[in-house]
């Protein structure tokens, strides 16, 4: 996460011109900065979200929710994992679901994002009870039980970090 954070901090100001451009720049930076499979997963997710927002100058909360859903789906498509496999998707899928549900209930974007963060944190903690079926932890089998999945926990951290910026 430290390398990812530094890669984001090192982006030039020009990377933040549009929502779609920002997401694409973040994806490229994270692809280079994060080792293992997480780098390509994050890069693909951010690029997919970027494409969803490409023609929208000022995305609405629903536009962001659709972009988030596209990003989450792209990780599952690329890696073949699903919620319940004890991966980052066990935080991402509940977060996307909660964000959608909260917006459908006419909650404001900040409140909807708070629900997403809570769902991600709960999902990440639930991975401690799961036997890994995908990802690097799958090699550990039942020995992984008792410790939350690192990828899911990382997701919950960065979703929480974004919370103060959602209005």
Name what the model sees in each region.
Residues 1-167:
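N-terminal loops that bind phosphate or other acidic moieties
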